[in-house]
């Protein structure tokens, strides 16, 4: 990552949402904050439900020239006209997703706290890797990624890196010099005004 370039915002959807209401919030966000990519982290297991949720968001995102990727379901991504897929299992299915979607698709991989897993994902064709959480949390085993993983990666590896999970203004300010993207989602959706909360978090990027 170039130290002269500020990290970009990668927006993660809530796991469930009303498409019309979500698109209204997205319109506000797009008007206020530059968004590099939107990820649909939909928890639904019904193909029809995923399609109903994806279609209006795709139309809106593409109208604003914002790429849209889908969590996990890489077999659906191309059919739905999406730009790619985000995988949560590290390097395990990157090669299969790349084979299914081709070279032009965006394929990202969440690699938890493991630098080795991130390197493996990159070798298998990932376009970016995400590590996290970066802050203290009580989810899973409670582990958080060490800052030196980002320091080493940003100094050594050209593949873009994403900071994800337990983001707050202090963590964002700390990691801004050593990451390419901040994946922001759960941090804003419980707020009455998600767009305003996103802007508040993004202020920590510009403050560095």
Task: List the model feature ranges, each with a label.
Residues 144:
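Acyl-donor (CoA/ACP) binding surface of acyl/acetyltransferases
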Residues 181:
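C-terminal binding/interaction regions
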Residues 1-91, 99-127, 141, 152, ...:
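Conserved N-terminal beta1-alpha1 strand-loop-helix module at the mouth
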Residues 131, 162-166, 184-186:
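Glycine-rich beta-strand-to-loop/alpha-helix junction loops that act as flexible
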Residues 94:
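Short alpha-helix immediately C-terminal to the canonical SAM-binding loop
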